């Protein structure tokens, strides 16, 4: 996992405005319902559901809301047939972009995704065109901790790698299926988890300049505004110097 310690620069997040928060919650609930419907309501035997629960909690969703969504999925109270689809393409500056969608209408979804690429100087690729550049991983963020103690706890919990960041925080990587159990182990050792989610880690990154970086951020914003888009992953990297100019 060496070379990916600047995850805060690699993955862009929009500000938590009220309208955006509502859209995020809608997408989280959709994933909770679908995960429970496909794999059952027990998070210990359904890693996709556990990952969805962890992400919902990290976004401050209440347990009551989470449980209601799971009950909808398990109880069959939602007849919508949602399917996961991943679109791959190229963004500004030759960046690789993966768009994870959850939709009941593939035609509607592609009609939202394709124009986003086109308007930002990118293009939608074929299946497998950039997917080989990414690995599916669990990512746990710790704001601050004693490095030796955290490393020991992370290894004991089954983590694959731990990377200290310049701001004193730590990024812990796991097999995506083990995200829940590793998080539990780290918390049991007394550490506070700031965020835990399943993500896609790029094997190589593309350094963006002051002209290209805003175009990629615009593409990400457009894609995340699409109702059917759950997650956007890319391998663009923005230096602190370029970020200061944006």
UniProtKB/Swiss-Prot annotation:
Pfam families noted in UniProt: TACO1_YebC_N, Transcrip_reg
Gene3D superfamilies recorded: 1.10.10.200, 3.30.70.980
Domain of life per record: Bacteria
PANTHER family for the chain: TRANSCRIPTIONAL REGULATORY PROTEIN YEBC-RELATED (PTHR12532:SF6), TRANSLATIONAL ACTIVATOR OF CYTOCHROME C OXIDASE 1 (PTHR12532)
Alphabetical keyword list: Cytoplasm, DNA-binding, Transcription, Transcription regulation
Record keyword Chloroplast present: no
A single GO molecular function term of this UniProt record: DNA binding
Record NCBIfam families: PRK00110.1, PRK12378.1, YebC/PmpR family DNA-binding transcriptional regulator
Single biological process term from Gene Ontology: regulation of DNA-templated transcription
Localization (cell): Cytoplasm
Gene Ontology CC entries for this record: cytosol
Coiled coil regions in record: none
Family, similarity comment: Belongs to the TACO1 family.
Protein name per its UniProtKB record: Probable transcriptional regulatory protein HAPS_0943
Alphabetized HAMAP family for the sequence: Transcrip_reg_TACO1
């Amino acid at each position: 996992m060496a070379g990916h310690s600047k995850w805060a620069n690699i993955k862009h997040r929009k500000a938590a405005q009220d309208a955006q928060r509502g859209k995020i919650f809608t997408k989280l609930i959709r994933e909770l319902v679908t995960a429970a419907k496909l794999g059952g309501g027990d998070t210990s035997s359904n890693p996709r559901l556990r990952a969805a629960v962890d992400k919902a909690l990290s976004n401050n969703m209440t347990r009551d809301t989470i449980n209601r969504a799971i009950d909808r999925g398990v109880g069959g109270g939602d007849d919508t047939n949602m399917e996961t689809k991943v679109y791959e393409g190229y963004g500004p500056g030759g960046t690789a972009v993966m768009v994870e969608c959850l939709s009941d209408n593939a035609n509607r979804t592609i009609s939202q995704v394709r124009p986003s690429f086109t308007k930002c100087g990118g293009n939608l690729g074929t299946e497998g065109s950039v997917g080989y550049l990414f690995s599916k991983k669990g990512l746990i963020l710790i704001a601050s901790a004693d490095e030796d103690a955290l490393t020991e706890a992370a290894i004991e919990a089954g983590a694959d790698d731990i990377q200290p960041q310049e701001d004193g925080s730590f990024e812990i990587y796991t097999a995506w299926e083990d995200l829940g159990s590793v998080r539990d182990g780290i918390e049991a050792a007394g550490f506070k988890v700031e965020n835990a989610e399943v993500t896609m880690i790029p094997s190589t990154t593309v350094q963006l300049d002051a002209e290209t970086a805003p175009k990629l951020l615009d593409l990400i914003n457009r894609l995340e505004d699409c109702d059917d888009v759950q997650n956007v992953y890319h391998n663009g990297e923005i230096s602190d110097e370029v970020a200061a100019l944006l």
